[in-house]
Curated annotation (Swiss-Prot):
The keyword Calcium does not apply. 3-dehydroquinate binds at S21, E46, W47, R48, R82, R213, S232, Q236. InterPro entries: 3-dehydroquinate_DH_AS, Aldolase_TIM, DHquinase_I, Type-I_3-dehydroquinase. Its EC number is 4.2.1.10. The lineage of its organism: Bacteria, Pseudomonadati, Pseudomonadota, Gammaproteobacteria, Enterobacterales. This is 3-dehydroquinate dehydratase. Involved in the third step of the chorismate pathway, which leads to the biosynthesis of aromatic amino acids. Catalyzes the cis-dehydration of 3-dehydroquinate (DHQ) and introduces the first double bond of the aromatic ring to yield 3-dehydroshikimate. It comes from Shigella flexneri. It comes from the Bacteria. GO terms for biological process: 3,4-dihydroxybenzoate biosynthetic process; amino acid biosynthetic process; aromatic amino acid family biosynthetic process; chorismate biosynthetic process.
């Protein structure tokens, strides 16, 4: 399988990489959170831009991105606007969503963007091409905070992301039962063994799905999300506990 290298981090080799999400509503909080996060043990910094209040001011958004880049220059920076329909804090038009991601790509400050699969096929394809032309990687994502579809549908979505040339397909689903967690893990394994030619990220959310955040190396998920302070999604555990478990499983 092809790995993805961002800065010096090789995603898709070794233990799953730890992603943490920074959620701050203004530049002052971005700065203070960044200083706190700098001391934590993680691999990729995700900036959840949908928590940022001054979204209409692109200069303000990029000033915040610059603070993150300068505070943690060695960490890959993932720029994520999570739409309201997929569990985010704000709703914006598709046009504004694409423009925001293009501005991030143009800035030269971010290493990766998160691009939601169901934004619209043409817009997704164009944005992937634009990102790649500027040496920015794309995590293509889908989130369902209500349910877990059948394994075939999970695999179909991941394969669609791969067909759109996402560098890393990602899916996060809400289990209604423990068997839903098994469905997600089985789909992950089948995708990884039969179809994936690049790293994928999968997770089952909430307390029921916590096990899926720990066993990625076994079933084929290349990264997992941990919490430095506040969790960005239900079921995340602290980065220190997460690193301990991932290391134990990797060395076993």
């Amino acid at each position: 399988m092809k790995t993805v290298t961002v800065k010096d981090l090789v995603i898709g080799a070794g233990a799953p990489k730890i992603i943490v999400s920074l959620m701050a509503k203004d530049i002052a909080r971005v700065k203070s959170e960044a200083l706190a996060y700098r001391e934590a043990d993680f691999d990729i910094l995700e900036w959840r831009v949908d928590h940022f209040a001054d979204l209409s001011n692109v200069e303000s958004v990029m000033a915040a991105a610059k603070i993150l880049r300068e505070t943690m220059p060695e960490k890959p920076l993932l720029f994520t606007f999570r739409s309201a329909k997929e569990g985010g804090e704000q709703a914006i038009s598709t046009e504004a969503y694409i423009a925001l991601n293009r501005a991030a790509i143009d800035s030269g400050l971010v290493d990766m963007i998160d691009l939601e699969l169901f934004t619209g096929d043409d817009q997704v394809k164009e944005t992937v091409a634009y990102a790649h032309a500027h040496d920015v990687k794309v995590v293509m994502s889908n989130h369902d905070f209500h349910k877990t579809p059948e394994a075939e549908e999970i695999i179909a979505r991941l394969r669609k992301m791969q067909s759109f040339d996402a560098d890393i397909p990602k899916i996060a689903l809400m289990p209604q039962s423990t068997s839903d967690v098994l469905t997600l893990l089985a789909a992950t394994l089948e995708m990884q063994e039969q179809y994936a030619d690049r790293p994928i990220i999968t997770m089952s959310m909430a307390k029921t799905g916590v096990i899926s955040r720990l066993v990625g190396e076994v079933f084929g998920s290349a990264a997992t999300f941990g919490a430095v302070k506040k969790a960005s999604a239900p079921g995340q555990i602290s980065v220190n506990d997460l690193r301990t478990v991932l290391t134990i499983l990797h060395q076993a």
